[in-house]
Amino acid sequence: MGVVIPEHKIQEVLERVDLVGLISRHVDLKKAGREWKACCPFHQEKTPSFYVVPEKRFYFCHGCRASGDAVSFVQRYLGKTFLDAVRDLARELGVDLEAEQDPSMRERQQIKEATDQAAEHFRAMLWQQDEGRSARAYIASRGVSDETAMAFGLGWAPLEWASLTERFQKLGMLEWAAKAGLVLKRNSGDGYYDFFRSRVMVPIRAPEGRPIAFGGRLIGADEGPKYLNSRESRLYNKSETLFGMDQSRDEIRKRKAAVLVEGYFDALGLHQVGVRHAVALCSTNLTAGHMQVLKRAEARELILLLDGDSAGLAAVERLSGPLLAAGATARVALLPQGDDPDTFARREGQEGVERLLEGAHPLTSHLFASLLPEGKAASFEEKMAALERLKPVVGQVPVGLVRATLFSAVAEHFGWRPADVEAALRSKVPLPKPAGGDAPPSSPNRPAPPLEKPPPALECFYVGAVLKEPRLMARDTFRVCDELSHMGLRMALAHATSGHGANDALFESSEAVKRGIESALRQLPSEPVPLEAAFLSICREIMVRRIDERLVYIKRATEQTPGAFDLTEETRQLLVERVELLALKKRVLEELKPASSGTKAPMQPV
């Protein structure tokens, strides 16, 4: 069975939970007749308008209209998903969820416990052992106080090969630690060794504060990458995790805004001076998953705090696609040359940072300034080059109002017409330069843009299966949804899973995407069991293909490598990645094995 919690179990949780007790942990409730009242935790107010009605098991705010039951309160206040909110409440109440018997859920719990043990081990190594002296000195040199270091749970992984391994061996948890990526099997196959060594450890926490992964900064050793992060697991998906969200959630909700930086220590430095609505990416680009996390924290605006050099401008370009695709309100604050958020915060303090944030400019203004500094005065060739760089950004924005507005803004900056901008961006062939001026020709005989490339059939089957049965997404334990290569399919999937349904998803899609999905829907089985079997087979095939493509690339990139002692750092990392990919492929083939009944996908698309 998939990870689907039976309805009667959810109802049991709602009936048994003490709603007043639950909410009073986070809100100062006062008795008011049969009800309880307080100032609303979801918006700022001076006069209480938030009421809890225990008899009816719901809460309601007369001010912002927030309302719901115990599960929705945990979701909204703690930033949890629906499934996690139900699980946490059930665990507290002792309700045995049938879904908890699923092997994937047992593994998730084992990884949680192993990660908790590792966090405690690293913390003790930093503060209670002489070995942690160099790490404490490094942390102090970064301007991080002991108080901040303790609040964020910083730790130390010593240089020894088996410091953490021995702890897990004594606890009988080595297998769990291996699943969490905290220890690795020796090449000889005999025993394990620590994944993190000689590193200042920064726990990456879920919104409720529990560690789910780690980032490690190399100290006092010259072997290995400067920064090393936990691999992804059933517990940790870097595309859906923002560092510091556990510390910043309340401030984000209060301000309705979040500050985004790209480094853990940047976020630490901002929090230390009082800018407590800052979060950081976990060594990945911004994704739709991150936007959902921010949405659950009620961030209506995102401010990018970036270096003022070429790297910062490149980051604006890189982050624009996901932000525009999500229709987010975003602004950009660029730091003075030579500063990063951490050093600037230490020198200027909260007041200086807040002043910089207040002066942040709209995202598109910075994007256009980066792509085409001269604006309308730029040459035709410069404008076409800027449009080429803009194509990947526009490709992430779905057809609709946001995309049309983007075309208009580009046209204004370029001094062109919106229709000409759209035609140039859709066409792979640059528009011809006009003889008499900078504006591109507007002849009605201009060739129509090429037809959209048809989406891959296998990916159409994946999206079609989810449209038929949205709960199948819970069976996507390998995050195949993140591997979809066709943006139109990704947008259709996002539209459907955000509550709009299959019909709306198809209505909003292009003709090519619509045809592909409709063809898949006709061929997919209708019955739940065969449909689930087909879905798992599709997931398996997509994952294996993606892994094989990457393995081929790594083979080509490393086959010309000289002797083992002459390996570059890049080659070493590729070889490590190859080992991890082979292990992942083995897991995929084992865990997504076709059902014994012989049920297969409706077809094997190429």
From Swiss-Prot:
How is the cofactor bound, in the record's words?
Binds 1 zinc ion per monomer.
Region named Disordered: 429-451
Binding residues annotated for Mg(2+) 2, in chain numbering: 307, 309
Q: Name one GO cellular component term.
A: cytoplasm
Q: Which GO terms describe its molecular function?
A: DNA binding; DNA-directed RNA polymerase activity; zinc ion binding
Summarize where Mg(2+) 1 binds, as residue positions. 262, 307
Q: List the Gene3D superfamilies.
A: 3.40.1360.10, DNA primase, catalytic core, N-terminal domain, Zinc finger, CHC2-type domain
- What's the Enzyme Commission number for this chain? 2.7.7.101
GO BP terms: namely:
DNA replication, synthesis of primer
Sorted alphabetically, the keyword list is: DNA replication, DNA-binding, DNA-directed RNA polymerase, Magnesium, Metal-binding, Nucleotidyltransferase, Primosome, Transcription, Transferase, Zinc, Zinc-finger
Where does the record place the Toprim domain?
Answer: 256-349
Q: Name one Pfam family in it.
A: Zn_ribbon_DnaG
Q: Does the keyword Nucleotidyltransferase apply?
A: yes
According to its UniProt record, which reaction does this protein catalyse?
Answer: ssDNA + n NTP = ssDNA/pppN(pN)n-1 hybrid + (n-1) diphosphate
PROSITE patterns xrefs: TOPRIM (PS50880)
Q: Where is the composition biased (Pro residues)?
A: 441-451
- Source domain of life: Bacteria
Q: What cofactor does this one take?
A: Zn(2+); Mg(2+)
CHC2-type Zn finger ranges: 40-64
Give the protein's biological function.
RNA polymerase that catalyzes the synthesis of short RNA molecules used as primers for DNA polymerase during DNA replication.
Subunit relationships: Monomer. Interacts with DnaB.
Q: What is known of its domains?
A: Contains an N-terminal zinc-binding domain, a central core domain that contains the primase activity, and a C-terminal DnaB-binding domain.
Family membership, please give it: Belongs to the DnaG primase family.
Q: What is this protein called?
A: DNA primase
Native source organism of the sequence: Myxococcus xanthus
